[in-house]
Amino acid sequence: RTGEVIPKSLITRIVNAKNYLAGYYQVRQLDFGELDMAWHTLKAKPKDDTLDFENAALEDYRVLPHFPGTAISTSFGHIFSGGYSAGYYSYKWAEVLEADAFALFQEKGIFDRETAESFRREILSKGDSVDPAVLYRNFRGHEPDSQALMKKLGLV
């Protein structure tokens, strides 16, 4: 309304605030995905209680100490209901695909007609008629790159 340019320092602070704790959030989501897969790849019933199972499943992934007596599994509905059993990782995978695909638009120009047409032709118009991984490679020209998500989050 004033016509003044927003100072670069304010823009930097806004971006930094958006990315605050992004690394922790990413690891937390990966913990959830790992725990989900651990429950759904059991070869036999766990011998120990839920806390022991979780601690074993997540011991290589935790970045913060576990709060004693708490269990994720008992309140994490995605694991056993809601249609996401053994699929929680798909949230993070979708973020990788989005960030990597959008990176091409950023490289070529957000409104680049050729890039938009390629996205429509190679992905949207095919629906579920071709393996999604093939469609993505056809559009992007390479496998999905998780570094695009890390860059988007300001982590690299």
Where are these regions (language model features)?
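Cation-handling catalytic/transport regions enriched in His/Asp/Glu
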Residues: 1-156
